Amino acid sequence: MKILSGREKAEQDLKQLKKELDELNLNRPIKLAIIQVGDKMESNRYVEQKLKKAKEIGIEAKCFKFDENITQKRLLLAMDEINENWDGILIQLPLPKHLPKEVILDAVPYEKDIDGLSHRNEFILYNEKNSDDKFFVPAAARAVLELIEHHEINYKKKKVAVVGRSHLVGKPVAHILKRRGASVSTFDENTPIKLVASADIVIVAIGVPKYIKAENIKQGAIIIDVGTNYDQNDPSVIFGDVDHESVKTKASAITPVPGGVGPLTVVCLLKNLVEIYK
């Protein structure tokens, strides 16, 4: 079974991105603001990775961390101030349940919405033939697509199953692959999982540990596991959304967790940020 690593490409792309930044010859560093509400361990880890990689290539990045119980009104007021002074703005998800996610995401100015999750950005992404406006592909979705291209996975006229319909991964990946010539079917927890078994390529981003097992895939299937799930008893242990031990006798190739889509996601976020200036 071939391992579809994303680490090497992530490091190469980060070096290339630094070179592009240097060539832009800006009179100040590009500035990235990360807005985090609460203190979830998983969110803290993701934020640390983003801050670290941004610093490596000369981007000025800062996390604005707010109390878990902050009101919608106070958060939006704080965001108004942040919007004035930062080039790219990212809302670290998930948000606490009392905050309406769509309202908070739409409070990020469209041109600074580097994770591409505002309604306006999504409208342009899914209707791009009718618009000349610039849009951002959500970083995790872009990472999946770039990893597929990097490993020269042929998806045109192939059956592709996208398990998970989130705005972060499943929905944009399915839309773009379909537009590029793949035969795409989408699934969620309410869809009969047995239908995945006919797919040549299975992309899994459903947020459920070890959701896909050997009996759910065909012999020789290529698996892209986007899931990152931390063991509650041992936070150093990470599971994907695929049971890797189970599928290893049937899959022809799979992305590792960690080390597959994850490293590329951070780099793709920074690519979106730098593209503001291109």
Curated annotation (Swiss-Prot):
A Pfam family assignment: THF_DHG_CYH
Keywords per UniProt: Amino-acid biosynthesis, Histidine biosynthesis, Hydrolase, Methionine biosynthesis, Multifunctional enzyme, NADP, One-carbon metabolism, Oxidoreductase, Purine biosynthesis
GO terms of molecular function: methenyltetrahydrofolate cyclohydrolase activity; methylenetetrahydrofolate dehydrogenase (NADP+) activity
Presence of the UniProt keyword Amino-acid biosynthesis in the record: yes
Gene3D superfamilies, alphabetized: Leucine Dehydrogenase, chain A, domain 1, NAD(P)-binding Rossmann-like Domain
CDD domains: NAD_bind_m-THF_DH_Cyclohyd (cd01080)
UniProt keyword annotation of Transmembrane helix present: no
A GO cellular component entry from the record: cytosol
GO biological processes: L-histidine biosynthetic process; methionine biosynthetic process; purine nucleotide biosynthetic process; tetrahydrofolate interconversion
SUPFAM superfamilies per the UniProt record, alphabetical: Aminoacid dehydrogenase-like, N-terminal domain (SSF53223), NAD(P)-binding Rossmann-fold domains (SSF51735)
Residues that, per the record, bind NADP(+): G164, R165, S166, T228
Pathway participation: One-carbon metabolism; tetrahydrofolate interconversion
Reactions listed under catalytic activity: (6R)-5,10-methylene-5,6,7,8-tetrahydrofolate + NADP(+) = (6R)-5,10-methenyltetrahydrofolate + NADPH; (6R)-5,10-methenyltetrahydrofolate + H2O = (6R)-10-formyltetrahydrofolate + H(+)
EC annotation from Swiss-Prot or TrEMBL: 1.5.1.5, 3.5.4.9
Complex and partners: Homodimer.
Family the UniProt entry places it in: Belongs to the tetrahydrofolate dehydrogenase/cyclohydrolase family.
The protein's role, per its UniProt record: Catalyzes the oxidation of 5,10-methylenetetrahydrofolate to 5,10-methenyltetrahydrofolate and then the hydrolysis of 5,10-methenyltetrahydrofolate to 10-formyltetrahydrofolate.
PANTHER family cross-referenced by the UniProt entry: C-1-TETRAHYDROFOLATE SYNTHASE, CYTOPLASMIC, C-1-TETRAHYDROFOLATE SYNTHASE, CYTOPLASMIC-RELATED
Protein name as it appears in the record: Bifunctional protein FolD
